[in-house]
């Protein structure tokens, strides 16, 4: 799937934050979202390229798309697996 930020129902600006802060912020934000909603995460910490996909697998969310070729890195995460 191509990266389409318009799919997002909520945006999390995590630029300037360093590990483990971006993933902690994602977890806190997603906790307050409804299943099926999509979170756009913008970050510039290189560790997010590893941590965000791992978080999604571990917490049973879907990483719909990721843009990691340029800064800021951007991720689309759908809450839940449905």
Curated annotation (Swiss-Prot):
- Gene Ontology MF: a single term: sulfur carrier activity
Q: Which UniProt keywords apply?
A: Cytoplasm
Compartments (UniProt record): Cytoplasm
Q: Name one GO cellular component term.
A: cytoplasm
Q: What is this protein called?
A: Sulfur carrier protein TusA
* CDD domains associated with the record: SirA
**Pfam families named among the record's database cross-references:** TusA
Q: Say what the protein does.
A: Sulfur carrier protein which probably makes part of a sulfur-relay system.
Protein's gene: tusA
**Entry keyword annotation includes Aminoacyl-tRNA synthetase:** no
The annotated active site, in chain numbering, is 19
- Biological process, per Gene Ontology: tRNA wobble position uridine thiolation
Keyword Cytoplasm assigned to the entry: answer is: yes
Return the similarity comment: Belongs to the sulfur carrier protein TusA family.
The organism of origin for this protein? Vibrio parahaemolyticus serotype O3:K6 (strain RIMD 2210633)
